[in-house]
């Protein structure tokens, strides 16, 4: 890995992928073998790679029948277009659309609602305001939220300690 930094404070994209994957397996009400689709971030970008690794780690790709996996480049409109195609292609068999971020999740939700498919379970990562509201409204399955306030506060503490020449941890993880 890259060692040319003083300290890292945060959580990993893999952890967010693991949490999202576990939710779909354990909490969503979906059954093993159900057909799902995955909307990814830009291929090769760290968020996409990490979140997909998280899905793999918890067995999501083996538990479900993943009928489609494609990038929407973190964009709502691209995700909506993909979801529209998949809803048409797979019909009633498509049970869920798992999104690597909430902006794409909101696009998939718009497509599902427009198609009258309120049964499709959709979830993502980021804790976007409209995604959190949609979870409260019962239209969006889940939004995995990274604790940005905790990351920011701890980041400041670590930076101050480093500036004072105090010993600091090279890697500080902030729980979700």
Report the location of each language-model feature.
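Extracytoplasmic "Venus flytrap"
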Residues: 39-50, 69, 98-102
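Hinge/cleft segment of the Venus flytrap/periplasmic-binding protein
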Residues: 39-43, 47, 57-59, 63, ...
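Short, solvent-exposed amphipathic alpha-helices that sit
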Residues: 16-20, 46-64, 78, 82, ...
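Hydrophobic alpha-helical segments within soluble ligand-binding/sensing domains
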Residues: 9-34, 78-79, 128-131, 147-164
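Short beta-strand segments enriched in small/hydrophobic residues
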Residues: 6-7, 35-43
